[in-house]
Amino acid sequence: MSDNIPNDPFADRESQNYENPIPSREFILEFLEQAGVPMNRNDLFEALKLAGEEQYEGLRRRLRAMERDGQLVFTRRQCYALPEKLEMVKGYVIGHKDGHGWVRPEGSVGKDDDILLPHHQMKNIIHGDFVLVQPTDNSKRGRREGRLVRVLEERNSQIVGRFFLEYGYSYVVPDDSRISQDILIPNEHKAGARMGNVVVIEITDRGSRSRGMMGKVVEVLGENMAPGMETQIAIRTHQIPYEWPEAVEKQIVNLGEEVPEEAKVGRVDLRELPLVTIDGEDARDFDDAVFCEKKKDGGWRLWVAIADVSYYVRPDSALDKEAINRGNSVYFPSQVVPMLPEVLSNGLCSLNPQVDRLCMVCEMTISESGKLSSYKHYEAVMNSHARLTYSKVSAILEGDEELRERYQPLVSHLEELHAMYKVLKEARDQRGAIEFETVETKFIFNAERKIESIEPVIRNDAHKIIEECMILANIASASLVEKAKEPALYRIHESPGELRLQGFRDFLSELGLELKGGLEPSPTDYADLARQIAGRQDQELIQTMLLRSMKQAVYNADNAGHFGLALKRYAHFTSPIRRYPDLLLHRAIKYLIAKEEGRNQDRWTPTGGYHYSFDDMDFYGEQCSMTERRADDATREVADWLKCEYMQDHVGDELEGVIANVTSFGFFVRLTDLHIDGLVHISTLANDYYQFDPIGQRLIGESFGNIYRLGDAVKVKVLAVNLDDKQIDFELVETSRKLRGEGKTAKKRAAEAKRKAKEKKRAATRSSSKESATARAVPAIEPTKRPEQTDSGRKRKGPKRGDDDSAKKPKVKKAHKKKPHSKPKKTKRTKQDAQ
């Protein structure tokens, strides 16, 4: 046995696992750290005082395993070194449709630290691989380049794509544009796939420098244009879990349709309180119910009852593990991938009308000025008195006699909710919460699951009433766990970064608008801006630019406040059926309640509460933020595909729209009635060279002076639709902006201006000559002044920097130019180009 083994803190573990143990991984890493230089295998063997062939072979295998796992690097000099000493970086590959890629360092957020991998470095790796790279001295567009050292963990998920057969060879083109390699499929692994089928494959061979990747078909999904296929592709492409594990199926098999009587014991009985649910017409899972009454001394008492999911989904159970994996429900236009099985999400947990349900209640008092005066949380049992919809509640509040008579016992309570909402809205405006009136759309499908129409979602006061009630409950819940210093997830939204903020301010200045607040504008400053743009034709577009300037809201164990809502603390409490962070918060609150009553059992409570650590919450924060982004990306991708499918029937139509985004390669137009975006490529514009002004968000023609600017009203013709690329191409028909120059080119205008300047100079010279002749006839009785002096005898100051009009012009970046009379050129672009 080595003399170094006793110094190994893990020597006992190694002795238990191996008859002839060698130093542990941890000890080898520490040894190399202290050595300060890379060492080859023989040097390590001697330095660690090992002996015999068995220990030599054991060391060889351990070093190879550590190299495989990225703990060590095998250098070109046949030595083992620590990755951090060689400035190597571990991270995940992010592919690009053009063939190159990036590595995002492990634990990094955002693309600022990404390392570029050139095309040749991506040949045998794909999007999602976990790799070790070494940054090089080269850089591209200000980003570091890297060299692939090793693949530490291959992407083990399946890939969705289109199956093709050409010249006797079968291959699959991945639907995910971030995977640029085609995958060869041997004949014995086609699994009956036919030309054009959408298939799911597994990669069996990563290939080499001279040979491409190979795979096998594991599932044939069907024809490319089959109804619902776009959703199936997105689910698999974005690795959204959609099948229930066997352990989950076993756990839910004994769940009934009614709440067990023993579960109601010890809870506050709210079954007589007229709580109601208010949701959309097509909602199937009901998380929340509300009731409001006027207080005698002024103000209101508000009950917000939320489905008690934590009673059924206990920590570390099969249901819980799958809920963590999913993170949230994913709502596609024609399908839902739930976080919980339907027996819970639409059954036992859903607050369906006229049935007993377990709930977590946040009971609050609201002052006449809209201030949250007090709150308390408790476990209860309830019975929803009605399943109302937003449209019904809105109609009741507007005086619909038939509905008011049908729901007569509830009308007065709904009116109190409305009265409280008005006060809450005023309080929200006063604290400076940022509120946008954006237009959302929904797809209307026919019996064949094809889109019949695209309609805007109308938000009425009923939507806003529920929104304010949920915000209040979330504030109260965040306040409770923060005051008790109980680990939980907060919903944080940080203030905008300096770079994005400056870009947004430059954009506003071009429109004659201003965002106050200096380097750190407050939510109130943004709210003031929102009031400035209210009613403008370009209001929606300015709001879009404002949103782009802000950071994304995330889940975090550390409370950093919510900038957009102008709140010091905020957490998600109101949707545990569809969001895992809410379920975590319920468990934390239950633990606090049980702890106060002396019912907790160490970290557990009898009804599903649990005390987590802050380290636990760090993990859950990253996981839940990731699954939320994953769901957003997947649903956005499906919506884009459906919009393209819908627009196929409108090719050749001329439609009204507004320029929604300007780039160096053209501008995107948002159709006024359909709210669909398409690209007017720079190559389709009138013959001219165009410059892109990123500050002014416009394209400027060099010769004719034509300007295409964000917010301009235009008419476009639908030129083409590409379903595979999810791309809609428009051609400009006319614009509301008057073209400049009346047909004169910039050269002609410059020549004319130069000619006029010369004539003016000649006239001034002739006038000066006449004055000089007159001056010589008059005796000089005043002393001659120095050229740099004024009448007062002081030195005359030159023009200030910036006085010249030309100095005020924003710098512009050269755009891609189109030669006169060239044909339209088909180009590919992704949504990233538009952001």
UniProtKB/Swiss-Prot annotation:
Annotated region (Disordered), positions in chain: 739-835
Domain annotation S1 motif: ranges: 652-733
InterPro entries the record matches: CSD (IPR011129), CSD2 (IPR040476), NA-bd_OB-fold (IPR012340), RNase_B_OB_dom (IPR013223), RNase_II/R (IPR001900), RNase_II/R_CS (IPR022966), RNase_II/RNase_R (IPR004476), RNase_R (IPR011805)
Matches recorded under Pfam families: CSD2 (PF17876), HTH_12 (PF08461), OB_RNB (PF08206), RNB (PF00773), S1 (PF00575)
Ranges of Basic and acidic residues composition bias in the record: 739-754, 783-793
GO CC annotations on file: cytosol
Main subcellular location: cytoplasm
Domain RNB: 267-593
SUPFAM superfamilies xref list: Nucleic acid-binding proteins
Cysteines engaged in disulfide bonds, as pairs: none
Biased composition (Basic residues): 755-764, 809-829
GO biological process: mRNA catabolic process
Entry EC no(s): 3.1.13.1
Role: 3'-5' exoribonuclease that releases 5'-nucleoside monophosphates and is involved in maturation of structured RNAs.
Protein name per Swiss-Prot or TrEMBL: Ribonuclease R
Organism of provenance: Vibrio parahaemolyticus serotype O3:K6 (strain RIMD 2210633)
